[in-house]
Design a protein with these regions (language model features):
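Short, hinge-like loop/turn segments at secondary-structure boundaries
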Residues: 13-17, 140-144
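General small-molecule cofactor/ligand-binding pocket signal
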Residues: 122-127
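Conserved dinucleotide-binding and phosphotransfer motif residues
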Residues: 119
């Protein structure tokens, strides 16, 4: 999950998707993080409990990792059973690009906010002003470069050049765009 590959499908299917913090789930020996750390490994599960169990069995440092999670004993399953502390939750109900938000989506967000308030959490409206174009431009460089490196590695495994038929259209676009950039970009 770098841009929602776990969270988005889960949300569309009534499942649970979590993107753990960077360094929490090891990628495996001899493999660097995807997309310069934006991409994180985990799973889509039927419940928070199932995700907690999988975090318990898969989290932790690995030799050679450049990013280490906080050290200490963590029991995610036990943590899922404890009531959370009172939270201050930012409610951002506008579209990132200023596009209209469907009324059903607005109502789902409002309903969730009311539920969180009923559980004792504080809800505060938020509307951060973000340099969206700059953010997505930088992300495009990072994801494209990561894709380029991954496909060069794949070409070595295959013993031939990677072709458009080997990948999904969005990945081919990332790959083609990255080939136009220099390291200075």
């Amino acid at each position: 999950d770098g841009g929602g590959s776990i969270r988005i499908p889960a949300s569309h299917c009534g499942l649970f998707g979590l993107k753990p913090s960077r360094g929490r789930i090891p990628f495996g020996p001899g493999k660097l993080e995807g997309w310069m750390g934006l991409s994180i490994q985990h799973v889509i599960t039927r419940s928070v409990r199932d995700s907690a169990v999988l975090l318990d069995v898969s989290h932790g440092p690995e030799p050679g990792s450049r990013v280490l999670p906080p050290v200490g004993d963590v029991d995610y399953l036990a943590g899922h059973r404890r009531p959370p502390p009172k939270l201050r939750i930012a409610l951002w109900d506008t579209h990132l690009f200023g596009l209209p938000v469907h009324a059903d989506c607005r109502e789902a967000v409002a309903k969730t906010a009311r539920l969180c308030e009923s559980l004792g959490h504080t809800i505060e409206p938020a509307a951060p002003k973000l340099p969206v174009q700059d953010m997505f431009g930088a992300m495009g460089v990072m994801t494209g470069t990561g894709t380029l490196v991954a496909f060069h590695d794949r070409a070595k495994q295959l013993g031939r050049d990677v072709t458009e038929a080997d990948m999904e259209p969005i990945n081919w676009r990332h790959y083609q765009e990255a080939r136009k950039r220099s390291a200075e970009d």
